[in-house]
Amino acid sequence: MPFTGRSQLLAPLIAFFTVSETPVEDLRDLEEDIDQEVGDVLDEGQRFLAEELFASDDLVDAIQEEEGKVLTVYRDITGLPTVGAGHLVRPEDGLRVGDRITEAQMREFLKGDLKQAEDGVRRIAKATPLSQNEFDALVDLVYNVGPGNVLPSKSPKLNEALARGDYAGVARELSYSKARDGRRAGGLVNRSERRRRMFERGEYGDPREG
């Protein structure tokens, strides 16, 4: 069964105590205690195969903070139609610059883009185990630059480091400071630093606020 994070570990215990008719307030206290213990385990850097991991809520929050939540289709710095949390508009979306989407549509786009990024990480990580924060940092990278740009042909050093299990080497390859048109972008520089801290330290906050 794929590892889906805290909820998967909590579910059997909560179900047991629910069947035993434990009072609701006690269940809430129990869930908080267990969640803290589980969080401590995951935060210590326990590693899993990438196929067992999924983007965490902390990463989703970080992505939305970096990308923004824009409900009107606009052109990004390279001129491509974009909407929501950095979703690149595709022909099948049926949207043009100036069109508006709903919050629900934004969430659906984000969900689909995250899945694509997760799959992109699984393709390059293969059998190399990753901690939750390492996986999240790589998902952010793929989400930001696109799955094609992290393949061996485009990012050979990143793939070589992953194949060797060289985590320090992977961290060094997380920086992408140029937009699709080759221009250096300050936002990408800052995001790369955030991504590196996420990978190395499990810190998800914006370093610009420190």
Please report, for each region that a protein language model flagged, where it lies by residue.
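Residues that flank catalytic or metal-binding motifs in active/ligand-binding sites
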Residues: L59, I77-G79, E134
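Substrate-binding/active-site groove segments that recognize
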Residues: R75-G98
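Aromatic-anchored, charged helix-turn/loop surface patch used as a conserved interaction hotspot
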Residues: P91, R96-A125
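Active-site nucleophile-His-acid catalytic modules used for acyl/amide transfer and hydrolysis
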Residues: Q116-S153
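Flexible, active-site-adjacent loop/turn segments at secondary-structure boundaries
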Residues: T72, P81, G86, T128, ...
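Long, amphipathic alpha-helical surface segments
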Residues: P2-E51, D57-R75, H87, A104, ...
